[in-house]
Amino acid sequence: MSQLFLILCFILTHFFAIATSLNDQGLALLSFKQSIQNQSDSVFTNWNSSDSNPCSWQGVTCNYDMRVVSIRLPNKRLSGSLDPSIGSLLSLRHINLRDNDFQGKLPVELFGLKGLQSLVLSGNSFSGFVPEEIGSLKSLMTLDLSENSFNGSISLSLIPCKKLKTLVLSKNSFSGDLPTGLGSNLVHLRTLNLSFNRLTGTIPEDVGSLENLKGTLDLSHNFFSGMIPTSLGNLPELLYVDLSYNNLSGPIPKFNVLLNAGPNAFQGNPFLCGLPIKISCSTRNTQVVPSQLYTRRANHHSRLCIILTATGGTVAGIIFLASLFIYYLRKASARANKDQNNRTCHINEKLKKTTKPEFLCFKTGNSESETLDENKNQQVFMPMDPEIEFDLDQLLKASAFLLGKSRIGLVYKVVLENGLMLAVRRLEDKGWLRLKEFLADVEAMAKIKHPNVLNLKACCWSPEEKLLIYDYIPNGDLGSAIQGRPGSVSCKQLTWTVRLKILRGIAKGLTYIHEFSPKRYVHGHINTSNILLGPNLEPKVSGFGLGRIVDTSSDIRSDQISPMETSSPILSRESYYQAPEAASKMTKPSQKWDVYSFGLVILEMVTGKSPVSSEMDLVMWVESASERNKPAWYVLDPVLARDRDLEDSMVQVIKIGLACVQKNPDKRPHMRSVLESFEKLVTSI
């Protein structure tokens, strides 16, 4: 009898230990899991109730106190309701459940998470009103509820969320007036998308107070009526304002931010008139001369031949105004005929087939310097690839789509009439760089030809603007793919084998720049946003050479390169990837800077965490896990769960990454050694 009692006590004690081994954070997550109807084994394979905490579970991130700070389960085909237990995770900072099939109303408990910074629920089937309690999320910076079935009005309860930078409510059933007060209070907004709803009334004047907007202000596909408020003229000129498919009426205000948007931004409003839709208003003369549209300078000699400056479209293609180009071309030709006795044309032989003679004519002067300085109305189109398949005329007639922008200019996707797709980077340097210097720099860039470096195809020069033309790379950048951003390669495609080959390709490109380029260059700003992915996910290192051309801020050295960014955060993205010693302006640029940055790219590839958005220092976090002998899966990207049999390879890559991010640059390996390590790893799997 006593033996039976002891056995019973042992069983009860063991059961109690199992039942209580998981902390309150894990229990809340298990309640969340239970509310999901189709629990995929691949998603919740390591959500184990016997764990002491949930910090190693797929999609879960914890801080140093083992409190859950983020839940990221995008595109996992999950369905069910959002369990109120999620509101008990009081340290939660980020929730990303986009592209699933969650349904029902948002639980009020969700809005008790006072520290929540990002809430991304796009692409689900949520419905009902957004609770008034959303105003309690005063730390919220990103709110994306797009592509759901929410209804009701957009409430002033959002006003307390003054830190909001991204507000995306598109493709729902929100109705009623857009309240006055949002624009004047949410002044930090960088993205505002309210398209495809049922919003009515006039556009509030205080929308013009959103002077920090970047990219697109999208109010399209609603039922807004009345006139376009003149306050929109306060918005940044590079912003694309989409007001299409509403019931707006009257003349379009003559502000550059609206004129630059192009006609597609106003289509579907039958009672609008004026430029850029070219429907005259009966009450006023709305004709705008080209100088008002394309330049602020009164002197016609300084106008640019490149009409790319006028293209601001991000969603719909904007046709380049070839007729205006011809107008300027004829004027240039007339001036050439008038002054032919005192002009000399210097035409590069390899340009004769693709360049109009007028673009390479300079007045005869006493010196080369005088020639270049005094003739600021000249333009040059220069192919850098002998097999180039387009000329300047074709480029000017092409459709252009704005892909992104940074502090050094804009990047467009250009589609030629024959279907050829190009990427055109438009640089602005305020005229400081003369033709001779520009051509010398781009010729140096063009000599860097490697399968893993984005190669320059052609360039165009004018005194105040420069164009660099590249092949268009279709699969976006590596950072977007890792983070699973919309429009990028699905993170599911980034298996461990694919990631390893991408890292090897980047190492090949950097090794070529370091070891085999004419001057053994330093790239200077390697990060995942300027690693582009080709059709077969082969990496292309982009942005090389830009710092030599653009007169950027003083923190960019003459031989450093600014990356192709798609956004312009307050703290520039590349600063998160910089080597510690690069912060000193007294330090000479070194190839070991690139090694450090590449080390961070490696860690981002392995962990799935970005140095920019992570709650903690990525290097310190991985180093700490290594020092505490944490299992590999503690730091690995949850998406890599299916490749668990390759864990040894992943551990080796983590070691390479940690070697590259040594604080002492002398202890970092050379890129050649890093490449050799990756070659061995790829061969071994």
UniProtKB/Swiss-Prot annotation:
Gene3D superfamilies noted in UniProt: Phosphorylase Kinase, domain 1, Ribonuclease Inhibitor, Transferase(Phosphotransferase) domain 1
Subcellular localization, as worded in the UniProt entry: Cell membrane
Keyword Membrane: yes
Residues bearing carbohydrate: N38, N48, N151, N193, N247
Modified residues (Phosphoserine): S399, S480, S590
SUPFAM superfamilies linked to this entry: L domain-like, Protein kinase-like (PK-like)
Annotated GO CC locations: plasma membrane
A Pfam family recorded for this sequence: LRRNT_2
Keyword RNA-binding: no
Membrane-related topology note: Single-pass type I membrane protein
Extracellular side: 22-305
InterPro entries the UniProt entry points to: Kinase-like_dom_sf, Leu-rich_rpt, LRR_dom_sf, LRR_N_plant-typ, PRK1-6/SRF4-like, Prot_kinase_dom, Ser-Thr/Tyr_kinase_cat_dom
Side Cytoplasmic, residues: 327-685
PROSITE patterns cross-referenced by the UniProt entry: PROTEIN_KINASE_DOM
Domain Protein kinase: 397-682
A single MF term (Gene Ontology): ATP binding
Signal peptide, first to last residue: 1-21
Family designation: Belongs to the protein kinase superfamily. Ser/Thr protein kinase family.
Protein name per Swiss-Prot or TrEMBL: Probable inactive leucine-rich repeat receptor-like protein kinase At1g66830
Protein's organism: Arabidopsis thaliana (Mouse-ear cress)
Record lineage: Eukaryota, Viridiplantae, Streptophyta, Embryophyta, Tracheophyta
